[in-house]
């Protein structure tokens, strides 16, 4: 007889700095209400994201009825990657009037390749268009 499947009781999506998860908000309250061992998650997440320190890494936590959990880390948000590559703190308050930085086509392609597993795109060209659109909406000019 095959083992019984665990019943899923919750799906939590968070964006946490890599290697810096701690029981303080937003992690503690989100996991606490599902009865998950918060420190166990923090240690596992910090170990899994140690190599990406400094970046914000989205995580999808699946909670089961026996209070156990599994989590999947995603690629950093496209907006954060664009800010990092452009070397700016934040996007433009008026993106269609005020441009704050420039990205080359090669930089956009590099970001698209990094984000490809999480993007809803069939090929790299479609992914580049998605990233370029995000950049434009932040007031970042894409050259090339």
From Swiss-Prot:
GO BP terms in the entry: translation
InterPro entries: Ribosomal_uL11, Ribosomal_uL11_bac-typ, Ribosomal_uL11_C, Ribosomal_uL11_C_sf, Ribosomal_uL11_CS, Ribosomal_uL11_N, Ribosomal_uL11_N_sf
Post-translational modification: One or more lysine residues are methylated.
Assigned keywords, A-Z: Methylation, Ribonucleoprotein, Ribosomal protein, RNA-binding, rRNA-binding
Pfam family, one: Ribosomal_L11_N
Domain of life: Bacteria
Gene Ontology cellular-component terms listed: cytosolic large ribosomal subunit
An example molecular function term from Gene Ontology annotations: large ribosomal subunit rRNA binding
SUBUNIT field: Part of the ribosomal stalk of the 50S ribosomal subunit. Interacts with L10 and the large rRNA to form the base of the stalk. L10 forms an elongated spine to which L12 dimers bind in a sequential fashion forming a multimeric L10(L12)X complex.
PANTHER family reported for this sequence: 60S RIBOSOMAL PROTEIN L12, LARGE RIBOSOMAL SUBUNIT PROTEIN UL11M
Name of protein: Large ribosomal subunit protein uL11
Originating organism: Streptomyces virginiae
Lineage: Bacteria, Bacillati, Actinomycetota, Actinomycetes, Kitasatosporales
């Amino acid at each position: 007889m095959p083992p019984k499947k665990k019943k899923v009781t919750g799906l939590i999506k968070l964006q946490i700095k890599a290697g810096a998860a701690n029981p303080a908000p937003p992690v503690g309250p989100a996991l606490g209400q599902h009865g998950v061992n918060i420190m166990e998650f923090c240690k596992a997440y910090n170990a899994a994201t140690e190599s990406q320190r400094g970046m914000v890494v989205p995580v999808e936590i699946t909670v089961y009825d026996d209070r156990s959990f599994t989590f999947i880390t995603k690629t950093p948000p496209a907006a954060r990657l664009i800010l990092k590559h452009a070397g700016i703190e934040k996007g433009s308050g008026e993106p269609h009037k005020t441009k704050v930085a420039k990205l080359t086509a090669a930089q956009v392609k590099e970001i698209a390749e990094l984000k490809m597993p999480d993007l809803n795109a069939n090929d790299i060209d479609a992914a580049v268009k998605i990233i370029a659109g995000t950049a434009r909406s932040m007031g970042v000019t894409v050259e090339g």
